[in-house]
Each structure stands twice: as C-alpha cells, then as structure tokens.
Amino acid sequence: MSNTRLTLFFTNIFQLLDSKIQNYSINFPIKILLLLLGFFIATVLATVFGQTGDWDVLVAGILVAMIEILGNKMYSKKYISKKQVFDISFLSLIGINYIKIGLIFGLFVDAFKLGS
C-alpha cells in the first residue's frame, strides 16, 4: 500500500487507539478487584449497621465525610500536576478512589434493594 495522506491518517489513528487501549488495560484486574472490594464493604456496612438502626445516621455521616475528604485530596491541584502521576502516594490514592467508587455503587444498589 502506498503512503498517501489517507493511509497515514488511518495508520496514526489506529496507533493512537492501540496505545490508549494498552494504557487503560494496565492494572485492569486490580481496578476491578478494588471496585468489588468497595461493593463488598458497602454490603457489609449496610447489613451489619442496618440491623440495629441506631448506627445508620452515624455511619452514613462518617462515610460522606470520608468520601468528601478523599475527593478533596484526589482532585486538589497538588496531585494533578504531571510529574507526580507515578508517585506511590498518588497510585495508592487512586486505589482508594476505586474502593470509594465501589462503596458508593454498593450503597446505591442497597438503597434500591430496600426501596423495592
């Protein structure tokens, strides 16, 4: 095939897509495991603390505070800079963020189970 502008364009597009897919597939099983861990923690919290009914408000307040603090740290300008992307503390913060997403999703699903 000759090197026309159209073939070069499609070659560059396919190379860009391939590099994006390879970047997203790094640590994919760990990310899924952390999401499921957060979902499991949400189920345990809803089951254990939901038995008495007295602890629901306190646990919900603590979870909301933890989620907001983590979101503040995750999206602050200190961690957004490019040179700290591969820092160990930033990678652990990303892992905790995946657990947080699983926790929120698990509580959301439990709320639907209780509502039906």
Curated annotation (Swiss-Prot):
Compartments, as annotated in UniProt: Plastid, Chloroplast
This protein's UniProt keywords: Chloroplast, Plastid
Coarse class of the protein's main subcellular location: plastid
A Pfam entry, by short name: DUF565
Keyword Zinc in record: no
Organism per entry: Mesostigma viride
An annotated GO cellular component: chloroplast
UniProt-recorded name of the protein: Uncharacterized protein ycf20
InterPro entries: Uncharacterised_Ycf20
Family, per entry: Belongs to the ycf20 family.
